[in-house]
Amino acid sequence: MLQKNLLKEWWVWVIALMGLILWLSSCTKPETTLYVCKAGQHDFKPSPVPFPFAAKTLTGWALLDSSCWYNDLGEDTQDWNKLAGVYRWADVVKNKNSFILAWRPDPMRNVFQLCLYENIDGANRPHESAIYKVNANQGFSFWFAESNGEYILFVDGTFLGEQDNDKPFKTIGKISAWFGGNQTAPHDMSLQMDF
């Protein structure tokens, strides 16, 4: 029901159209930061301090390096890694109520799956019905479109999903890249991102 209401809103279509225009017209890579996760760690560094701010629409650009692909974690290979997102600042912790763009390796070498991933009252809720695939070293843009404390997610202009959580996100903090799931990074990984 929320999706039907959101898709009737003019601002959703304006943001989607702006995103499509930006994506089609982008000829150069934006200024990015290199994030590195060392083998045996979870956190990609540098790890920015998540200062609180009022909920708003956020845009970003990322590129997953071929070093991010792996297939040696057994059943944990299917866990979702976090790329970027927002969380409710009032909850203090990032994994209680959050709205995230997540990634994992595809079975095909050097291909990655992207999806919307939520934490709702501490429960993990990946939206696996809408998977977007990118190749290693292929840049992509993403948009966290916000209205009245609710978010929807687009990647390269493709709608990936909307917020299922009924708690409004009024004051938020940013979530940055994180490996896992249960396991830590099996080897050094790097990605580029502007968020």
Can you describe what each PLM-predicted range is?
Residues 163-195:
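Flexible glycan-contacting loops in extracellular carbohydrate-active proteins
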Residues 138-146, 151-153:
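Short tryptophan-centered beta-strand motifs in secreted/extracellular beta-sheet-rich domains
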Residues 2, 21-42:
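Bacterial Sec-dependent N-terminal signal peptides
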Residues 32-114:
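Secretory/extracellular carbohydrate-interaction modules
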Residues 1-25:
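Sec-dependent bacterial lipoprotein signal peptides
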Residues 115-141:
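Short, aromatic/His-centered strand-loop micro-motif at the edge of beta-sheets
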